[in-house]
Amino acid sequence: MSQDTKYEIMYIIRPNIDEEAKTALVERFDTILKDNGAEVIESKDWEKRRLAYEMNGFREGIYHIVNVTSPSTAGAINEFDRLAKINDDIIRHMIVKVEA
């Protein structure tokens, strides 16, 4: 029996995205996690913040946080990581394993 692992995913969305596109982006990435075996516990916008330094030409971004549990054998985290790297609407992302 594989133990479920808890993860916190934080990603920064470009600030000039319209609300409808942002909602679609968040839903798309939540669905990617669910379809690959993860359970999304919480998915919420944190706030629009100024960045410490310019990234991809932006000085601020919309921070979004997702709390997830996923079996270690599921590819949900790897698939999220792969797709977030190639998405132009996501400036940066970080995946952290939460210790129990």
Curated annotation (Swiss-Prot):
One of its GO terms (biological process) is translation. Keywords: Ribonucleoprotein, Ribosomal protein, RNA-binding, rRNA-binding. It comes from the Bacteria. The keyword rRNA-binding applies. Pfam families: Ribosomal_S6. The keyword Heme does not apply. Gene3D superfamilies: 3.30.70.60. GO terms for molecular function: small ribosomal subunit rRNA binding; structural constituent of ribosome. GO terms for cellular component: cytoplasm; ribonucleoprotein complex; ribosome. NCBIfam families: S6 (TIGR00166). HAMAP family: Ribosomal_bS6 (MF_00360). Belongs to the bacterial ribosomal protein bS6 family. Binds together with bS18 to 16S ribosomal RNA. PANTHER family: MITOCHONDRIAL 28S RIBOSOMAL PROTEIN S6, SMALL RIBOSOMAL SUBUNIT PROTEIN BS6M. This is Small ribosomal subunit protein bS6. The gene is rpsF.
